[in-house]
């Protein structure tokens, strides 16, 4: 019988009576001889049914084992050892074991007896869960291919989600992969550990940091990667408010954003958030910009007929010039003349069809009053992303980085969004970044270019950044060697952000590997249990019957039975009682691991 299953043999009442009867004898022995006292004490324990070695072993198992401590400087050597391990395991998850059916049956017995908390040890959870296979734990080495199919991490606040993310991120840095970390919280410890690991691996120069509060940040342009203007317009339109009066104008707002980007392309100006805001603020920019571009184009052609045609159009404009108060009414005829000029140039093969010019002319032809309604929701959006220090970080005049640069050069990128301080700005910027990543993945996929180094994308508090682009990355980015790891507290967070249970299940359905730390939320624990394998557990039952018969007298009977029933390999009730830093992990092949995370210390801390 295992020590963790040892029960006192004698009934509690009998043990108590026997102990009371032995007290006078112990007192008499203590008064005459110490040897007799010790002998009597041992006999008393044996008679009371207390098996001392198992009892001591049981008490020792109730104490949570100390967590392993790693320093950032040790990760390069750890990664090398993991890569050389038998079986090709190259991701270290701490100490643990493969959870099997026998563990599930033992856990069911603990659940039937009732689990006791271990809060006195400061780790939360319950001691029985920790005691299972405590002395048979081995280093957990997860095959790297298991993380390629995307991963999801569930765990309530303070259970170790960030510790697990930190361990996965720092090992990816040590393996030399491209690493992108989007941190809505702005955890300074996480940023410090990434920097220390990068330096320890000789990759200190590869690290780029973007902090929306401007703390030691490098300029970054989340709009620099695109194939056409409509792509940028669609990205920004996804950030617009949903529902209400703005919903009816959303398609027109996207047209205005696209036309603004088209005008910047025609003028050769950088496409940044600030430049788009500058264009979209004034409807007149579209007409004046298109006219200036056509004049410059005709000047480059050095064609006398084209110059004469432009002069005649300008002459007609002068003859039919409207009063100052009728500027809005004269906009349509002015755009019509520009369209006429474009048609004449195309007819004489002096100008090729230009989609960007058509976008600008279409927006210039829009009624001014209607344009104000269309752009009413876009202006506040762009304004928040161009405010204060964000203007220099995201739209600065100097050189800036982009995700195309990060992926192409195999660098390390960390961004702190500080959603706790400004949730609106942080969430919008995070969604813009996910849209840029989806665009990069789409271009690589279309070109058939798979990055040599895997692109690891880690998103903490993923529910803050849920969007259509995140779903697209999960659905399709694996084909270009992208691997996403998402972390969140509860399943309800995903349901709320996606607008329904189906949307949340769509995200989880794309994650092959599932990590779960302690889940205080019952619905989350049940959801994790639903995605785990099942096994057969025995249920014992007993019955005592008494029957009084006039002829046969009193009859009695005792029956015991054991039947098997299907039960989860790790039940939701136990998942809600896991100690801190302990986790279960369901792999893509169906195996279930249970482990204890190590603590990743900094260079300034002692291990």
Stretches found by the model and what they are:
Residues 32, 42, 192, 469-470, ...:
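Hydrophobic alpha-helical membrane-insertion segments
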Residues 3-6, 125, 131-136, 144-159, ...:
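P-loop NTPase motor domains
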Residues 1-159, 163-168, 397-401, 560-565, ...:
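Basic- and hydrophobic-enriched, low-structure N-terminal and domain-boundary segments
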Residues 31-34, 282, 387, 521:
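Short, solvent-exposed helix-helix connector turns and helix-capping sites enriched
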Residues 489-493:
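Conserved H-loop
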Residues 5-9, 46-49, 244-262, 402-404, ...:
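P-loop NTPase motor core of the ASCE superfamily
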Residues 486:
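Active-site-proximal binding-pocket segments
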């Amino acid at each position: 019988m295992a020590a963790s299953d040892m029960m006192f043999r004698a009934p509690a009442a009998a043990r108590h009576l026997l102990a009371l009867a032995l007290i006078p004898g112990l007192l008499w022995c203590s008064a005459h001889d110490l040897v007799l006292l010790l002998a009597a004490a041992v006999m008393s324990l044996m008679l009371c049914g207390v098996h001392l070695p198992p009892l001591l072993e049981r008490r020792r198992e109730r104490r949570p084992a100390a967590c392993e401590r790693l320093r950032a400087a040790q990760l390069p050597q750890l990664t090398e050892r993991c890569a050389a391990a038998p079986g090709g395991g190259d991701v270290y998850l701490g100490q643990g074991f493969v959870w099997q059916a026998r563990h599930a049956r033992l856990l069911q017995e603990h659940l039937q007896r009732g689990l006791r908390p271990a809060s006195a040890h400061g780790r939360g959870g319950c001691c029985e869960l920790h005691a299972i296979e405590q002395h048979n734990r081995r280093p957990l080495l997860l095959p790297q291919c298991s993380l390629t199919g995307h991963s999801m991490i569930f765990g309530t606040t303070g259970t170790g989600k960030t510790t697990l993310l930190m361990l996965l991120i720092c090992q990816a840095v040590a393996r030399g992969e491209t690493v992108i970390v989007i941190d809505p919280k702005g955890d300074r410890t996480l940023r410090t550990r990434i920097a220390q690991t990068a330096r320890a691996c000789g990759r200190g120069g590869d690290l780029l940091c973007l902090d929306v509060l401007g703390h030691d940040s490098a300029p970054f342009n989340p709009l620099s990667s695109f194939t056409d203007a409509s792509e940028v317009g669609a990205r920004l339109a996804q950030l617009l408010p949903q529902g209400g009066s703005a919903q009816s104008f959303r398609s027109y707002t996207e047209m205005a954003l696209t036309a603004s980007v088209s005008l910047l392309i025609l003028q050769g100006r950088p496409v940044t958030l600030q430049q788009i805001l500058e264009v979209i603020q004034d409807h007149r920019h579209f007409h004046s910009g298109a006219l200036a571009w056509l004049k410059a184009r005709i000047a480059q052609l050095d064609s006398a007929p084209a110059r004469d045609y432009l002069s005649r159009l300008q002459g007609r404009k002068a003859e039919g010039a409207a009063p100052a108060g009728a500027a809005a009414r004269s906009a349509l005829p002015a755009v019509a003349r520009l369209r006429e000029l474009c048609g004449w140039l195309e007819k004489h093969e002096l100008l090729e069809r230009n989609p960007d010019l058509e976008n600008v002319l279409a927006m210039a032809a829009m009624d001014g009053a209607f344009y104000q309604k269309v752009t009413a929701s876009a202006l506040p959006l762009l304004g928040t992303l161009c405010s204060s220090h964000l203007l220099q970080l995201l739209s600065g005049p100097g050189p800036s980085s982009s995700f195309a640069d990060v992926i192409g050069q195999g660098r390390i990128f960390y961004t702190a969004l500080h959603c706790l301080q400004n949730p609106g700005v942080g969430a919008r910027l995070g969604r813009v970044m996910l849209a840029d990543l989806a665009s990069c993945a789409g271009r690589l996929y279309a070109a058939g270019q798979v990055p040599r180094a895997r692109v690891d994308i880690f998103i903490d508090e993923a529910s803050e950044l849920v969007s259509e682009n995140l779903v697209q990355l999960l659905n399709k980015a694996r084909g270009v060697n992208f691997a996403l790891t998402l972390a969140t507290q509860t399943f309800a967070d995903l349901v709320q952000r996606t607008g329904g249970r189906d949307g949340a299940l769509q995200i989880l359905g794309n994650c092959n590997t599932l990590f779960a730390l302690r889940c205080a939320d019952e619905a989350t624990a049940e959801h994790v249990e639903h995605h785990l394998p099942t096994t057969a557990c025995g249920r014992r039952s007993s019955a005592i019957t008494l029957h009084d018969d006039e002829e046969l007298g009193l009859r009695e009977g005792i029956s015991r039975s054991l039947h098997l029933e299907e039960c989860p390999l790790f039940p939701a009730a136990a998942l809600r009682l896991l100690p801190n830093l302990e986790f279960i992990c369901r792999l893509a092949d169906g195996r279930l691991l249970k482990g204890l995370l190590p603590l990743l210390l900094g260079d300034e801390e002692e291990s």
